UniProtKB/Swiss-Prot annotation:
A Gene Ontology BP annotation from the UniProt entry: L-arginine biosynthetic process
Listed pathway(s): Amino-acid biosynthesis; L-arginine biosynthesis; L-ornithine and N-acetyl-L-glutamate from L-glutamate and N(2)-acetyl-L-ornithine (cyclic): step 1/1; Amino-acid biosynthesis; L-arginine biosynthesis; N(2)-acetyl-L-ornithine from L-glutamate: step 1/4
Upper taxonomic lineage: Bacteria, Bacillati, Bacillota, Bacilli, Bacillales
Source organism: Staphylococcus aureus (strain MRSA252)
Function summary: Catalyzes two activities which are involved in the cyclic version of arginine biosynthesis: the synthesis of N-acetylglutamate from glutamate and acetyl-CoA as the acetyl donor, and of ornithine by transacetylation between N(2)-acetylornithine and glutamate.
Protein name (Swiss-Prot/TrEMBL): Arginine biosynthesis bifunctional protein ArgJ
Amino acid sequence: MKHQETTSQQHNFSIIKHGDISTPQGFTAGGMHIGLRANKKDFGWIYSSSLASSAAVYTLNQFKAAPLIVTEDTLQKSKGKLQALVVNSANANSCTGQQGIDDAQQTQTWVAQQLQIPSEHVAVASTGVIGEYLPMDKIKTGTEHINDANFATPGAFNEAILTTDTCTKHIAVSLNIDGKTITIGGSAKGSGMIHPNMATMLAFITTDASIESNTLHQLLKSSTDHTFNMITVDGDTSTNDMVLVMANQQVEHQILNQDHPQWETFVDAFNFVCTFLAKAIARDGEGATKLISVNVSGAKSISDARKIGKTIVSSNLVKSAIFGEDANFGRIITAIGYSGCEIDPNCTYVQLNQIPVVDKGMAVLFDEQAMSNTLTHENVTIDVQLGLGNAAATAYGCDLSYDYVRINASYRT
């Protein structure tokens, strides 16, 4: 399929129509059904034709799953170099002890043998039910098909990493660096157990840009802090979260770092990809009907702005009110008040879908019908101005519907 581009407003990059994880030069991706799920795809992979500078950030849950432990160790041993990633859904390989570690490493070995690369250049990831061992006979079957062109489509990869997601999440953008066109692609999964810091979510980013691993890690950490770490669905933090980026340097240009004259252009495009994927995850929250964006400004510090935003979007009462299309702004100011951050009610201003509801800590009369009409929209925005400083942040989440309980009450059955 020929990719089409549209220029993103106010940005120096273009969004590639139908762009995906394998749009950057030198990358392929694929996926297939190996029997971990009843009939859906459950095993996927990404491969770069050349060694790629790589970096990853991981869950803060202390019960870190085996594949994350193995991948983190792999990146340390390889000094931030990867050439392939393999991921399975339906089984988290978490709380599986040494056998889980051994199974993840065996998966690495099988993939490396098929691709004829060192095992320390293979990352592994898993998502799904916690506490069950991987059926290694099925995993081996998957690894044996990595070179099979019949399964080598990015769409198959996008499907293979899903669990309770209702849709795939992918994007690619292109930009000009040193007169050369470079591309950044991304794919993610996540629907339930989404909460800062990074919850049951996996995100993978590829680029054909030339950039070193240490610079890539700094960029990924910075971007994750205000994108993936600013989303919440249900307040639970998973054992398997990971965001991983690979840059295979297929496009030759001056090495990108903070001293490059177009560094900020690259950062802008990279952040856009991360933000797009993070919002797609929040929008696809289990049972969700609305995406909630909370913009906090005027905070004393960036940490306060982030914490207040996340507190509001994590509130079950706020989420329930949005689902019910009820302009109950009292739940918003209550969340602000118990956030633990420095606030002054007399300086606080709140808007719901651009309609003022609180001014200097006092309720503002508003047209109930006009407000009700805006709350039927799929996108709901809460703006909070604290009037204390210059720090700002945005958090993303979704409403809380009846379907959330239905989905999670029967997750293992």
